[in-house]
């Protein structure tokens, strides 16, 4: 075969023109050491704090320590395949997670990857996990309620949309139960929920997900799970990932509720990461910025005004405020609320629900200590009917606890004191509530009205809860119009109050209590 010289030159030219000679300029470094999910990397001269790094095997890490001659990075996920001498690349990006309604009903890990075996999540948007909280001008005061469906909380420690309310107590006092009941009660109320499980057993998280599915709550809930078997870095970042998913709804004029269960384990994970990065330890071996760890997370829970939402959505959503309500959980050791992390979170939040082991063991569940549980802003958000009726309950309980302690030493009591003690016993019994059975507003209103107006005084303490259930059934079947009016208006007019009194008296005549 004979080739023409001109053809050869044309062939060479066409081959040369087809070559891609674009050089990719990337900042690279070398792994010096890898221990317990922490990598020391030499090089990476242009790396930024919090930047994502690309390791071999499609693994990513986060640059946390920027030192003179090396970078300390945490590996997100498996790190066993990374070895000394491997090449690490800068990505120029910070950590992002998928956000949007596509995540509802799913269980994801810290990076937003599905772990429930239901296939991929086709989220159209992603967002950074570390964001600056809305400023003072962008916020609006808390004025709408988040109904938890728990009598003792809605009556005495009300929570508003955009509030941060701490749930604090020893292990096995029902902290998760309060949070899960609150999520179940949001059904049909237009509140999206995010449940962040940090450092819990996988079996415990699976049980929570099963309960949410049974009550139809997974339709509006995202579960972010960083189990005890996940790395410390994944546990520390899970709360921020969940917060970003919740902010998606807040910034678009929707209402969201996020539960961090629990921030004690997040602080432990952060302490572990910090000590492995050789940061100097402080009180209780926590690093110096452990307060900032929680404050920058909880400040992102807020109620934002209409202007903020309109500006964020470029005018697509107008006339709507958005909110993200946070229920952080803190586990105490032997009731010690003066430890480092509990005091930090108490000072950051807008109130706390304190759960006590003694009350829990005495069968008073939810085991809420009414004396030291407070809500600093929720009173403004309480529904009118509950606000009218709940004033007496807290006073009754406080006086009852005081008198009960005093009555142990007194042999003869006057009638007024005895009456006060009897009323207190009945109110304490009335505030007991089984798990996964949240109440609607009208049910709570009927129970409080009956307690305040002496309808329970002649009922045996052991019959209080059956009496309450019977009363609710009676109202629902025979006085449906009254029930609907209270539920719709969230108020109790004089006519409705008279009708409610007549309905309770009607029930008293027919019931065998």
Curated annotation (Swiss-Prot):
<feature type="binding site">
    <location>
        <begin position="169"/>
        <end position="176"/>
    </location>
    <ligand>
        <name>ATP</name>
    </ligand>
</feature>
<dbReference type="InterPro" id="IPR036121">
    <property type="entry name" value="ATPase_F1/V1/A1_a/bsu_N_sf"/>
</dbReference>
<keyword id="KW-1003">Cell membrane</keyword>
<dbReference type="InterPro" id="IPR027417">
    <property type="entry name" value="P-loop_NTPase"/>
</dbReference>
<keyword id="KW-0066">ATP synthesis</keyword>
<comment type="subunit">
    <text>F-type ATPases have 2 components, CF(1) - the catalytic core - and CF(0) - the membrane proton channel. CF(1) has five subunits: alpha(3), beta(3), gamma(1), delta(1), epsilon(1). CF(0) has three main subunits: a(1), b(2) and c(9-12). The alpha and beta chains form an alternating ring which encloses part of the gamma chain. CF(1) is attached to CF(0) by a central stalk formed by the gamma and epsilon chains, while a peripheral stalk is formed by the delta and b chains.</text>
</comment>
<dbReference type="GO" id="GO:0046933">
    <property type="term" value="F:proton-transporting ATP synthase activity, rotational mechanism"/>
</dbReference>
<dbReference type="InterPro" id="IPR023366">
    <property type="entry name" value="ATP_synth_asu-like_sf"/>
</dbReference>
<dbReference type="InterPro" id="IPR000793">
    <property type="entry name" value="ATP_synth_asu_C"/>
</dbReference>
<dbReference type="InterPro" id="IPR033732">
    <property type="entry name" value="ATP_synth_F1_a_nt-bd_dom"/>
</dbReference>
<keyword id="KW-0472">Membrane</keyword>
<dbReference type="InterPro" id="IPR020003">
    <property type="entry name" value="ATPase_a/bsu_AS"/>
</dbReference>
<dbReference type="InterPro" id="IPR000194">
    <property type="entry name" value="ATPase_F1/V1/A1_a/bsu_nucl-bd"/>
</dbReference>
<dbReference type="Pfam" id="PF02874">
    <property type="entry name" value="ATP-synt_ab_N"/>
</dbReference>
<dbReference type="InterPro" id="IPR005294">
    <property type="entry name" value="ATP_synth_F1_asu"/>
</dbReference>
<keyword id="KW-0406">Ion transport</keyword>
<comment type="similarity">
    <text>Belongs to the ATPase alpha/beta chains family.</text>
</comment>
<dbReference type="GO" id="GO:0005524">
    <property type="term" value="F:ATP binding"/>
</dbReference>
<feature type="site" description="Required for activity">
    <location>
        <position position="373"/>
    </location>
</feature>
<keyword id="KW-0997">Cell inner membrane</keyword>
<dbReference type="InterPro" id="IPR038376">
    <property type="entry name" value="ATP_synth_asu_C_sf"/>
</dbReference>
<keyword id="KW-0067">ATP-binding</keyword>
<protein>
    <recommendedName>
        <fullName>ATP synthase subunit alpha</fullName>
        <ecNumber>7.1.2.2</ecNumber>
    </recommendedName>
</protein>
<keyword id="KW-0547">Nucleotide-binding</keyword>
<keyword id="KW-0139">CF(1)</keyword>
<keyword id="KW-0813">Transport</keyword>
<dbReference type="Pfam" id="PF00306">
    <property type="entry name" value="ATP-synt_ab_C"/>
</dbReference>
<dbReference type="Pfam" id="PF00006">
    <property type="entry name" value="ATP-synt_ab"/>
</dbReference>
<dbReference type="GO" id="GO:0043531">
    <property type="term" value="F:ADP binding"/>
</dbReference>
<dbReference type="GO" id="GO:0045259">
    <property type="term" value="C:proton-transporting ATP synthase complex"/>
</dbReference>
<dbReference type="GO" id="GO:0005886">
    <property type="term" value="C:plasma membrane"/>
</dbReference>
<keyword id="KW-1278">Translocase</keyword>
<dbReference type="InterPro" id="IPR004100">
    <property type="entry name" value="ATPase_F1/V1/A1_a/bsu_N"/>
</dbReference>
<keyword id="KW-0375">Hydrogen ion transport</keyword>
<comment type="function">
    <text>Produces ATP from ADP in the presence of a proton gradient across the membrane. The alpha chain is a regulatory subunit.</text>
</comment>
């Amino acid at each position: 075969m004979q080739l023409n010289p001109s053809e050869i030159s044309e062939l060479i030219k066409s081959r040369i023109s087809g070559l891609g000679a674009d050089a990719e300029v990337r900042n690279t470094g070398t792994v010096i050491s890898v221990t317990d999910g922490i990598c020391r990397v030499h090089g990476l001269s242009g790396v930024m704090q919090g930047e994502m790094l690309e390791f071999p095997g499609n693994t990513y890490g986060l640059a946390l320590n920027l030192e003179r001659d090396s970078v300390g990075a945490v590996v997100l996920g498996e790190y066993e395949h990374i070895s000394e001498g491997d090449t690490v690349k800068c990505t120029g990006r910070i950590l992002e997670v998928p956000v949007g309604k596509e995540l509802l009903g799913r269980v994801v890990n810290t990076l937003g990857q599905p772990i429930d075996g239901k296939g991929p999540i086709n989220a159209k948007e992603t967002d950074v996990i570390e964001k600056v909280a809305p400023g003072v001008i962008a916020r609006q005061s808390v004025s709408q309620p988040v109904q938890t469906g728990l009598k003792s909380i809605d009556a005495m420690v009300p929570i508003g949309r955009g509030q941060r309310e701490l749930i604090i107590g020893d292990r096995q006092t029902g902290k998760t139960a309060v949070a899960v009941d609150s999520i179940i009660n949001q059904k049909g109320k237009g509140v999206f929920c995010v449940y962040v499980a940090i450092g819990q057993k996988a079996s415990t998280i699976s049980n929570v997900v099963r309960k949410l599915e049974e009550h139809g709550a997974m339709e509006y809930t995202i579960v972010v799970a960083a189990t005890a078997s996940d790395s410390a870095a994944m546990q520390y970042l899970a709360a921020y990932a969940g917060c970003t998913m919740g902010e998606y709804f807040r910034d678009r004029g929707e209402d969201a509720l996020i539960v961090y269960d629990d921030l004690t384990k997040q602080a432990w994970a952060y302490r572990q990461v910090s000590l492995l990065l050789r940061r100097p330890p402080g009180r209780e071996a926590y690093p110096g910025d452990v307060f900032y760890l929680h404050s920058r997370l909880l400040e992102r829970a807020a109620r934002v005004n209409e202007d903020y939402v309109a500006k964020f959505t470029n005018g697509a959503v107008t006339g709507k405020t958005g909110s993200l309500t946070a229920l952080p959980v803190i586990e105490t050791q032997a009731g010690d609320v003066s430890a480092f992390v509990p005091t930090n979170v108490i000072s950051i939040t807008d109130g706390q629900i304190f759960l006590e082991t003694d009350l829990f063991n005495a069968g008073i569940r939810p085991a809420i200590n009414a004396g030291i549980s407070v809500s600093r802003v929720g009173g403004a958000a309480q529904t009118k009917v509950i606000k009218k009726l709940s004033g007496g309950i807290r006073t009754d309980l406080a006086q009852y606890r005081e008198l009960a302690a005093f009555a142990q030493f007194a042999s003869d009591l006057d009638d007024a004191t005895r009456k006060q003690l009897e009323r207190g016993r009945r109110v304490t019994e009335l505030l007991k509530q089984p798990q996964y059975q949240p109440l609607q507003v009208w049910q709570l209103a009927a129970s409080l009205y009956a307690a305040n107006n002496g309808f329970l005084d002649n009922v045996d303490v052991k019959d209080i809860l059956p009496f309450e259930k019977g009363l609710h059934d009676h109202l629902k079947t025979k006085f449906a119009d009254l029930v609907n009016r209270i539920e719709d208006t969230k108020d109790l007019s004089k006519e409705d109050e008279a009708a409610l009194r007549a309905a309770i008296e009607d029930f008293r005549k027919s019931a065998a209590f």
